[in-house]
Amino acid sequence: MISSADSGRDAAWLDDFLALTLAGGTPPAHAGECAAHAVRWRWLGDGLLQFEPVDATRRMQSVLVSAGVHGDETAPIELLSMLVRDIAHGALPLRCRLLVALGNPGAMRAGERYLDDDLNRLFGGRHAPLATSREAPRAAQLEAAASAFFATAGRARGARWHIDMHTAIRASVFEQFALLPHTGEPPTRTMFEWLGEARIAAVLLHTAKGSTFSHFTAQTCGALACTLELGKVMPFGANDLSRFARADAAVRNLVSGRRDAARAALPRVFTVVDQITKQSDALELFVEKDVPNFTPFAQGTLLARDGDYRYAVRHAQERIVFPNPSVKPGLRAGLLVVETTLDTHAALA
């Protein structure tokens, strides 16, 4: 049996998981107990940490919470490190199996979005051809960790969750919004109610399979998965974490088996209808450099030109999300969405 003294000494680094990760350090032990021996933990590698109640059962939910897939999106990383601390001290009771993932430690240490390639476009095996990319082995490691974690999870609807937390490069009409991956199944009321609890203002529904971490866990691991965009990119230590309080509380409620007593309104919904794809470095994007996400444009408005390629708004109104002319040729330079709130809410499963 692990003594209290040994357990406390070996787990002291859990007070600042972020500091250990930024230092590229290794904990003195790779497994142990915390929270007065109520929780088992395992360090699975750089930025990867698994918790499990000592009395865990197969009926428990399995929850993956990730942040730092983009290394400069610091606020969710800081929140996740504090979540680890509070679980370790027993301040936050754990009522699920939990995998914590700091997505791109190399980019976090460099203070960059990524080192060679956007990690959140390398999942679903898209990392395989990129032999020289420093992100490619990390994508493979995250896929393997998620697959192993969910392999022993329950299979009931809602038994598997993945919350991938980000912040955005630009401002947004809706400061905090979520993206749901396309799986071929209708969105669930369970997820929408949780997003409402997190006070997420809008949800973007993808209509094609993608290459993000949440797409991978939804499609391959059968998780209820979402990507959260929680505000603006800021350096470590410069975040006003109070702005993320509702989302943080919702994550904490999820892992501790609690629910917000106040029934929140469901978020508005926007569905992807098209995208602007960068054909070449000659791409011209006819929107202001700092245009907020979800800015609306009227039918007929020319938004992009790239050689013979043109994109003009086809619907009565379309909103642009993630406009970025600086991506590599062949990648998405912007998404176009239309509002589908009423139809989506009516069809929730």
Swiss-Prot record:
It catalyses: N-succinyl-L-glutamate + H2O = L-glutamate + succinate. It comes from the Bacteria. Pathway: Amino-acid degradation; L-arginine degradation via AST pathway; L-glutamate and succinate from L-arginine: step 5/5. One of its GO terms (molecular function) is hydrolase activity, acting on ester bonds. GO terms for biological process: arginine catabolic process to glutamate; arginine catabolic process to succinate. The active site is at E229. Its cofactor is Zn(2+). Zn(2+) binds at H70, E73, H166. Binds 1 zinc ion per subunit. Coiled coil: none annotated. Keywords: Arginine metabolism, Hydrolase, Metal-binding, Zinc. Its EC number is 3.5.1.96. HAMAP family: Arg_catab_AstE. Belongs to the AspA/AstE family. Succinylglutamate desuccinylase subfamily. Transforms N(2)-succinylglutamate into succinate and glutamate. This is Succinylglutamate desuccinylase. It comes from Burkholderia thailandensis (strain ATCC 700388 / DSM 13276 / CCUG 48851 / CIP 106301 / E264). The lineage of its organism: Bacteria, Pseudomonadati, Pseudomonadota, Betaproteobacteria, Burkholderiales.
